[in-house]
Design a protein with these regions (language model features):
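Short, structured segments at the rim of ligand-binding sites
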Residues: 1-436
C-alpha cells in the first residue's frame, strides 16, 4: 500500500494540463468492441482504472497498440467470448466498476453479456438496474446468480424500443446506447443522461456509422444499423481534474494556470467556484487563477441565506466535485451547505478534515454545513487514509494547505483517477513524496 508524505503550507506556482477525462475513457474504450475495424483513441489518461480496462479488453482478445503517450489503437476482430466465464475475468471484472460498460457492446454484437458484480469506490449503493432494465426492454433475457454474484444477459437479436429511464444514469444511458446502435429498429431513450461523456460517446459512435439523434439532450433516438466501422476519437480534458486544480489554487493561495480546459464542456463548474469567492480569468482555452492572498468569501443568496451547493444531473453540478467544494469552503469566509444527493457515504471523510481543524457539521449522510475559517488559522497536518478517489484528492489538497507534514495512506485510490499526481504537483512546487 502506497503512502504520500506531504509538507503543507507552501505556495505553488506554474501551469498544469488536465489529463483526458476518466469517465469518458471508460465508455469510449468499451465502444471499440462494437466493430471489427481499427479504432484509434487519443488523450487516454494513464490511470489505474483505465489501464485495468485496457488490460481486460486485451484479455478478451482485442488487439491493442500503444502509438504514443495517451494514444492507442484497438481492433476487436477476434474476441474470445469464452473468457467471460473464466475465473480470471471474474477477478478482473470485480476490481473495476467500469467493466459494466462492456456488457452493452458484447450483448448487441455477440448476443451475450456477462459481468461479475463490479467494484469501484465505496461510496454507498450504486444500482445497476438502469443498465439491465434497458437491455430487457431491447429484448434481452436477464439472470442474476446470487451465489456467484454475477449478471448475465443473452439475446439472439436486440430490437429497438421506447424507454423512460427511472434515473438519468450516465453509465446506464451509455450502455443502453451502445446496445441499441446495432439493434433492429429505433430506440428512444427519455430521461437520458446528457453529460459531456455521453455526448462524446455518441459523437464517436456516429463517426463509426451509427445513427444517433438528440445528442446533448435528455431525449436520445437511435436508429439501429447493421455494422459499425473504425474511427479516430479524442477524449476531452477531465473536468473533475480541472475543478480539483481550481480548488488546489484557492486552498494554497497559489497562482496557477490550467491549460487547454475545453471551456465549452465545463458547464456550471466555473460558476460554482465563483460562488465560493474564487476569482479566475479565462484566457483563450486556459484558466488563470491568481494567488488569493486575501482569501475568498462565499456568496450568500440574495435574501441573505447561506449558499447551498448540491449535485444534480447535467447540466447541474457533478457529484464528483462536491468533496473539492467542501474542502475549499473550510478556509473561505462564510458558510455553505453541501448536499450530496446521489451517494449516501461520500461525506464520511469529513472527520479527517475536522481532525485537521475544519469546522464542519454533518447534518445527515447526505448533508454537511461548512463554517469557513477564512485562513485565520491553517489546517493542522495529520495522518489519514484515502477512502475513495474524490475524497482522496480533497484530503490531498487539505494536506497541501495545512501546517506541518501529513501522511495519506491508501493512495492507490487517488491513482485510480489522477495521472502522475505527485509528479505534476512537484512541478508546481509541492513538497510531496511517494513512499512504497
Amino acid at each position: 500500500m502506497g503512502v504520500f508524505k506531504i509538507e503543507g503550507g507552501h505556495t505553488l506556482k506554474g501551469s498544469i494540463t488536465p489529463q483526458g477525462a476518466k469517465n469518458e475513457a471508460l465508455q469510449v474504450l468499451c465502444a471499440v468492441l462494437l466493430t471489427d475495424q481499427k479504432v484509434t483513441i487519443h488523450n487516454i489518461p494513464d490511470i489505474q482504472d483505465v489501464n485495468k480496462l485496457i488490460s481486460l479488453l486485451e484479455n478478451l482478445g482485442v488487439k491493442i497498440q500503444k502509438l504514443g503517450k495517451g494514444t492507442y489503437s484497438f481492433q476487436a476482430d477476434d474476441i474470445n467470448i469464452d473468457y467471460l466465464k473464466s475465473e480470471a475475468f471474474h477477478t478482473e471484472g470485480q476490481a473495476l466498476r467500469g467493466s459494466i460498460m462492456i456488457v452493452g457492446p458484447l450483448l448487441t454484437r455477440f448476443g451475450v453479456g456477462y459481468i461479475p458484480k463490479p467494484g469501484g469506490d465505496k461510496i454507498g449503493r450504486r444500482r445497476l438496474d438502469t443498465h439491465f432494465d434497458g437491455f430487457i426492454k431491447l429484448g434481452a433475457h436477464f439472470e442474476y446468480d446470487e451465489n456467484n454474484f454475477t449478471y448475465s444477459v443473452v439475446a439472439k437479436k436486440l430490437k429497438g424500443s421506447y424507454m423512460l429511464l427511472e434515473e438519468a444514469s450516465v453509465t446506464g444511458t451509455s450502455n443502453i446506447i451502445m446496445a441499441a446502435v446495432l439493434a433492429e429498429g429505433t430506440t428512444t431513450i427519455y430521461n437520458a443522461a446528457c453529460e459531456p461523456y455521453v455526448q462524446q460517446l455518441c459523437r464517436m459512435l456516429n463517426a463509426m456509422g451509427a445513427d444517433i439523434q438528440g445528442i446533448g439532450s435528455n431525449l436520445i433516438t437511435i436508429n439501429g444499423v447493421e455494422r459499425l466501422e473504425g474511427c479516430t476519437h479524442t477524449i476531452l480534458p477531465d473536468m473533475i481534474e480541472i475543478g480539483s486544480w481550481i480548488g488546489l489554487a484557492a486552498m494554497t493561495r497559489s497562482e496557477i494556470t490550467i491549460k487547454n480546459v475545453g471551456w465549452e464542456h465545463l458547464g456550471i463548474i466555473p460558476t460554482i467556484f465563483q460562488k465560493l469567492g474564487i476569482t479566475f480569468e479565462k484566457k483563450n482555452d486556459d484558466i488563470h487563477i491568481p494567488a488569493h492572498t486575501n482569501g475568498y468569501e462565499i456568496q450568500n443568496y440574495i435574501d441573505g441565506s447561506i449558499l447551498t451547493v448540491a449535485d444534480a444531473p447535467w447540466p447541474g453540478f457533478t457529484p464528483d466535485l462536491l468533496s473539492i467544494v467542501l474542502v475549499v469552503a473550510t478556509q473561505a469566509r462564510g458558510e455553505v451547505l453541501i448536499h450530496q444527493k446521489m451517494f449516501e457515504s461520500r461525506l464520511f471523510f469529513i472527520d479527517k478534515l475536522i481532525d485537521m481543524g475544519a469546522k464542519i457539521i454533518l447534518c445527515d449522510p447526505h448533508r454537511a454545513t461548512v463554517i469557513g475559517n477564512g485562513f485565520r488559522s491553517p489546517l493542522r497536518a495529520t495522518l489519514m487514509t484515502s477512502p475513495d478517489i474524490r475524497a482522496g484528492i480533497a484530503l490531498l489538497i487539505a494536506a497541501l494547505s495545512a501546517k506541518g507534514t501529513s501522511t495519506i495512506y491508501n493512495i492507490e485510490q487517488i491513482d485510480r483517477g489522477y495521472e502522475n499526481i505527485d509528479g505534476r504537483l512537484k512541478a508546481l512546487g509541492a513538497q510531496i513524496v511517494r513512499v512504497s
